[in-house]
Amino acid sequence: MQVDEQRLHFRDAMASLAAAVNIVTTAGHAGRCGITATAVCSVTDTPPSVMVCINANSAMNPVFQGNGRLCINVLNHEQELMARHFAGMTGMAMEERFHQPCWQNGPLGQPVLNGALAGLEGEISEVQTIGTHLVYLVAIKNIILSQDGHGLIYFKRRFHPVRLEMEAPV
C-alpha cells in the first residue's frame, strides 16, 4: 500500500470514530482565536488534565502557545453553526466569530461559550510534535458545567446531535 493510500485509509477509518465537537479558544497578549476540534480527550482526573491535538500547520498554534492558556468548549446539539464558523466552513472572520453575544470571559480570561455543555479553562503544560500535529497537554484550572442540552458529535464527516432519551417515570 502506498503512503498516500494508507493515509487516506487511516483518515476514512478515523471518520468512523464518533467524537465530541469542541471549540478550543484562547485569549491573551498573543491574541484571540479559536478552532473546532474533535481530537480532544481526558488524560487524568488527578490532576484534571486534557489532551488537545491541532494540525501543526494551523495559524492558531503560535497564539495558543503565546498565551499559554485555553478553554475547551464542549458543544451542545444546537451549536453546530458555531462549530462550522470555527472550522472555517462559513468564511466568517475570526474576530467576527467572537463578536457574537454568546461569549463571556472565564475566570482565567479565556473565551467561554455560553450554553456549551462544558467549558474547561486551563494552562498549557506541555506541547509535543507528533507527525503532522501538535499535542497540547492542558492542566485544567476551572470547569463550567451546564445541566441543559444534548451532545454534538462528528461522525462520517458530518455533524450529528446526540440526544438523551427521557427516563420513563417509575
UniProtKB/Swiss-Prot annotation:
GO terms for molecular function: flavin reductase (NADH) activity; FMN binding; NAD binding; oxidoreductase activity, acting on NAD(P)H; riboflavin reductase (NADPH) activity. It is an enzyme of class 1 (oxidoreductase). It comes from Salmonella dublin. It catalyses: a reduced flavin + NAD(+) = an oxidized flavin + NADH + 2 H(+). This is 4-hydroxyphenylacetate 3-monooxygenase reductase component. It comes from the Bacteria. Keywords: Aromatic hydrocarbons catabolism, Flavoprotein, FMN, NAD, Oxidoreductase. Homodimer. 4-HPA 3-monooxygenase consists of a reductase component HpaC and an oxygenase component HpaB. Pathway: Aromatic compound metabolism; 4-hydroxyphenylacetate degradation; pyruvate and succinate semialdehyde from 4-hydroxyphenylacetate: step 1/7. The keyword Isomerase does not apply. InterPro entries: Flavin_Rdtase-like_dom (IPR002563), HPA_mOase_red (IPR011982), NADH-dep_flavin_reductase (IPR050268), Split_barrel_FMN-bd (IPR012349). GO terms for biological process: benzene-containing compound metabolic process; pyrimidine nucleobase catabolic process. The keyword Chloroplast does not apply. Belongs to the non-flavoprotein flavin reductase family. HpaC subfamily. Pfam families: Flavin_Reduct. Catalyzes the reduction of free flavins (FMN, FAD and riboflavin) by NADH. Subsequently, the reduced flavins diffuse to the large HpaB component or to other electron acceptors such as cytochrome c and Fe(3+) ion.
